[in-house]
Amino acid sequence: MNDSEFHRLADALWLTIEERLDSWDGDSDIDCEINGGVLTLSFENGSKIIINRQEPLHQVWLATKQGGYHFDLKGDEWVCDRSGETFWDLLEQAATQQAGEKVSFR
């Protein structure tokens, strides 16, 4: 994968997160902000989830209250380089915990 392909895929990931939060009808308010390639989800309790791209490594990084995760593209799925869990699974787990209610991005 070259840098432009990586950015296209990361942009698509950011857009999907935004669209799914816009259509989410939960009780909690989750704000989504993109600034300089960093996507920040802010929760009512003041906690945050930070998602950013690491261009030199062609990775997506996820920072949550539970810890930090690094994802490589495997086929059409972003997969954690340590646990093998998917980006969507770990994002949903973290968002659900930080929102205090089930959050789904699928």
UniProtKB/Swiss-Prot annotation:
A cellular component annotation (GO) from this entry: cytosol
NADP in keyword set: no
GO molecular function: ferric iron binding; ferrous iron binding
Keywords: Iron, Metal-binding
InterPro entries: CyaY, Frataxin/CyaY, Frataxin/CyaY_sf, Frataxin_CS
GO biological process, one term: iron-sulfur cluster assembly
Task performed by this protein: Involved in iron-sulfur (Fe-S) cluster assembly. May act as a regulator of Fe-S biogenesis.
Alphabetized NCBIfam families for the sequence: FeS_CyaY
Family statement drawn from the similarity comment of this UniProt entry: Belongs to the frataxin family.
UniProt name for this protein: Iron-sulfur cluster assembly protein CyaY
Organism expressing this protein natively: Salmonella typhimurium (strain LT2 / SGSC1412 / ATCC 700720)
Upper classification of the organism: Bacteria, Pseudomonadati, Pseudomonadota, Gammaproteobacteria, Enterobacterales
